[in-house]
Each structure stands twice: as structure tokens, then as C-alpha cells.
Amino acid sequence: MEESDFSASAYDQVYDAPRPEIFFKSLPEKAVGPHEAVGIRKDAHWNVPEPELALIINAQGSIVGHTIGNDMSSRDIEGENLLYLPQAKMYDRSCSLGPWIVLGSDDATVRSWSIGVTITRSEEMVFSGDTSISQIKRSFQELADYLFRSQRFAHGAVLMTGTGVVPNDDFTLEQGDVVTIDISGIGSLTNPVIRV
């Protein structure tokens, strides 16, 4: 399984573009918490978790905390056509957040954290990977500022910062898998996987 050449080149370009890639991920009712099941689409064949740092932003656009996010993605749908990205990213149980919000951490501290993911299937580890939050190119406040341009969030927003760890192209999640994402300064977010 692979993404189209156009999709791959479009993603490469965004890292050096003046404007960051920001798009709408989820309504609150599409997200789940710790130990609740995340979903894989029944009409997709290549589904992966995307472990991400999540910024908790108040209604004024200021970052007030951090948590762990899992941006579930149907890579075959996304790779077929970039215009299908909303279908690949936003569906029931396509996002998990938790286990809690860490308040008061400055950017230098947050950038020192590591992020990792493990996936188990029938109690056997089938994937693990990790990276450092310091690999995020843009400043966290720049991302928040772009999100709040020309729009308001009366109750604030959660902004997931993108992933640096994804399983190999020959891997897909299966119903019954368990995904655990760890961020060193926050803790662990664990979710079983179901088909939706």
C-alpha cells in the first residue's frame, strides 16, 4: 500500500510553506477518552494511529495545557486523493485524547519530551516507535495563532500538532488491537480498536 506521488509531494511541501497545514479534525462527539475504543473505517484497508501532542487552547487563543492525541487515519483513502482527507480523518471514534491535561509547562520543557507508540495484537507487540517533540518545526503558539485566524472558538480548542511516528506501509490496524501512546511529560493514552 502506498500514497499517490501527488499526495506524498504535497505533504513534503507543507513543511517549508509559510502557512502551516491546519484542518478541522473532529467534533467533540467523534472523540473518545482513555480506554474507550478508537475506530477504524469499515470501508478502508490501511488504517493507522498517529500519536500527537495536543495543545489545549483557551477562547483567547492562548495555550494553557497539553495532552496526548491519537489522530486515527485511513491511509488508503487519504492516499487515493487528497480531497478525500476529511473522509480519511473524520469519522466516529477517529480521535482519542487524554489521559489528562498537564498545565503550566513552558515550550522548552514540552520540546524536551519524547513521544512513542506501541500496538499490541493478541497481547503481542506488533509495532513500536518513538520520536522527540523537538522535531516539530513550528512554534506551538504559531500553530495556535493560525488556528484562531478569522475564526472564534467560544470554548477554546484542542490542536493536535502532527505525527512523527507511523507504522510501515505494510502495517494496518485490526479490530482488537490496543494502541498505547506515551508522552514523557504527560503519561499514557491507551485505546482498544474497533471497526466502525
Sequence positions of predicted segments:
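Catalytic-pocket segment enriched in acidic/His residues
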Residues: 73-196
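Active-site microenvironments in enzyme catalytic cores
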Residues: 1-123
